Swiss-Prot record:
Keywords: Endoplasmic reticulum, Heme, Iron, Membrane, Metal-binding, Microsome, Monooxygenase, Oxidoreductase. This is Cytochrome P450 3A17. GO terms for molecular function: heme binding; iron ion binding; oxidoreductase activity, acting on paired donors, with incorporation or reduction of molecular oxygen, reduced flavin or flavoprotein as one donor, and incorporation of one atom of oxygen; testosterone 6-beta-hydroxylase activity. Its EC number is 1.14.14.1. The lineage of its organism: Eukaryota, Metazoa, Chordata, Craniata, Vertebrata. One of its GO terms (cellular component) is endoplasmic reticulum membrane. It comes from the Eukaryota. It catalyses: an organic molecule + reduced [NADPH--hemoprotein reductase] + O2 = an alcohol + oxidized [NADPH--hemoprotein reductase] + H2O + H(+). It comes from Cavia porcellus. GO terms for biological process: oxidative demethylation; steroid metabolic process. Induction: P450 can be induced to high levels in liver and other tissues by various foreign compounds, including drugs, pesticides, and carcinogens. It holds the Pfam family p450. It is found in: Endoplasmic reticulum membrane; Microsome membrane. CDD domains: CYP3A (cd20650).
Length: 503
């Protein structure tokens, strides 16, 4: 049997030419950094360096930082991405040249109307949306929302107590994920849910689908390898966000607006109501109200951006406290002294608790939810005396910087004292960036810290956390783009009432 197909000469020539053209496409940009004398990992045809992310972007960035120093080049498919780690360079990108050159984040996936979301929007559209939304994240607005969040602090304690009373170790992500989801839906949409006990609630089920991304899936890889497919997918109305979830929230926002226009009753404060209310003010050249589509995009993105920030960080904090019982005890002492008899904190008191702040900051140093900060240049630019063309991506490997021994003695150790008042002054704000930096930093930073700190206070007022045989020590991190443990964190949870009775 002839194993080689009997094609005509013309067919063989066409096939050979196609392979040559494919190879040229697959490698045409891969000499970009070599010409500039910038080191970096060798890219593969078509894929660039993305297959190296299989062990985790955080791991890849640490290895590159150790091997190549303060600057290196990599390729996401054919796209060149410059990695920088020097504080002066980082400041130039995130602050000094934010509006002129590095206004926009890298966004390569088809997003449909979600392109209007704050995190994805670009240039003047982003500036206008950011200005509109900033007034909803002031400390005054967060104080208005604090009673809602307090309510879910009690639900969190109740749910965890029910699990702890079973006498078995507790998988934390399910409990903390429910707390995060409940708060997001309540503060974004004004809807009360109990996602742990009602997982089939449509709000819960539709919201849960929004952050189920696999960035190494064939669909998303196709966009990385063939960037032109993004436009094709957009034309075909194909998005990385699940259509049924988008349709559900579209209908809800439309119905909420209709009720908002018809009702004069005072509504419970939530971000959707605040955005709808802002449409009542007269537009000016510098103050144009959000459109209905823009409001919808922000509402949905609150879910995407907020869920992992709270739930995963809470898991990492409790793991760190369980493996460092001296730190846990010291934090409980601060909480008990500041809030005797399990008193509920006020917003201001909570934000002034020094050791609580130290513990949260050190956890965010070790486990920043996002591994990287990325920008896309909209003009030609210079860094370190070298010229780069418009469209070059710039990446800051925040996880690698948070674990850099140049800035952090014994960087893999959990030491809240790094963030004491005395030591905090020595921390470079362009090295420690759990929420980014500059005009395009995370707008929800205060909200995230409020949710984290309230949960921590209520948890440690009521429980102590211990390692058990199911606890993975040392903790291994997963390969997801958003930082998570490789395996769920499981701890023994003991009511402090029992501890006191048994003392």
């Amino acid at each position: 049997m002839d194993l080689i197909p009997s094609f005509s000469l013309e067919t063989w020539v066409l096939l050979a030419l196609s392979l040559v053209l494919l190879y040229q496409y697959a490698t045409y940009s891969h000499g970009f950094f070599k010409k500039l004398g910038i080191p970096g990992p060798k890219p593969l045809p078509l894929f660039g360096n993305v297959l190296s992310y299989r062990k985790g972007i955080w791991n890849f960035d640490i290895e590159c930082h150790k091997k190549y120093g303060n600057m290196w080049g990599l390729y996401d498919g054919p796209r060149p991405v410059l990695s920088i780690t020097e504080p002066d360079m980082i400041k130039a990108v995130l602050v000094k040249e934010c509006y002129s050159v590095f206004t926009n984040r890298r966004s390569i996936f088809p997003a449909g109307f979600m392109k209007k979301a704050l995190s994805i929007s670009k240039d003047e559209e982003w500036k206008r949306i950011r200005t509109q939304l900033s007034q909803n994240f002031t400390s005054g607005k967060l104080k208005e929302m604090f009673p809602i969040i307090k309510q879910y602090g009690d639900v969190l304690v109740k749910n965890l107590r029910q699990e702890a009373e079973k006498g078995k170790p507790v998988q934390l992500k399910e409990i903390f994920g429910a707390y995060s989801m409940d708060i997001i839906i309540a503060t974004a949409f004004g809807v009360n849910v109990d996602s742990l006990n009602n997982p089939h609630d449509p709000f819960v089920s539709k919201a849960s689908k929004l952050f189920r991304f696999d960035f190494l899936s064939p669909f998303l890889l196709s966009v990385v390898i063939f960037p032109f497919l993004t436009q094709l997918y957009e034309m075909l109305n194909i998005s990385i966000f699940p259509r049924d979830s988008l349709n559900f929230f579209t209908k809800f926002v439309k119905r909420t607006k209709e009720n908002h226009l018809e009702s004069n009753e005072k509504q419970r404060v939530n971000f959707l109501q605040m955005m709808l209310k802002s449409q009542n003010f007269k537009d000016t050249e510098s103050h144009k109200a959000l459109s209905d589509v823009e409001i919808l995009a922000q509402s949905i993105f609150f879910i995407v951006a907020g869920y992992e920030t709270t739930s995963s960080t809470l898991c990492f904090i409790m793991y760190s406290l369980a493996t460092h019982p001296d730190v846990q005890k010291k934090l409980q002492q601060e909480i008990d002294k500041t809030l005797p008899n399990k008193a509920f904190p006020t917003y201001d008191v909570m934000m002034e608790m020094e050791y609580l702040d130290m513990v949260v900051n050190e956890t965010l140093r070790l486990y920043p939810v996002t591994n990287r900060i990325e920008r896309m240049s909209k003009k030609d630019f210079e860094i370190n005396g070298m010229s780069f063309p418009k469209g070059t991506g710039v990446m800051i490997p925040s996880f690698a910087l948070h674990r850099d021994s140049k800035y952090w003695p014994e960087p893999d150790e959990f030491r809240p004292e790094r963030f004491s008042k005395k030591n905090k002054e020595n921390i470079d704000p362009y090295i420690y960036m759990p929420f980014g930096n500059g005009p395009r930093n995370c707008i929800g930073m205060r909200m995230a810290l409020m949710n984290l700190k309230l949960a921590l206070i209520r948890l440690l007022q009521n429980f102590s956390f211990y390692t058990c045989k199911e606890t993975q020590i040392p903790l291994r991190l997963g390969s997801q783009v958003i930082l998570q443990p490789a395996k769920p964190i499981i701890l023994k949870v003991v009511s402090r009432d029992e501890t006191i009775r048994g003392a």
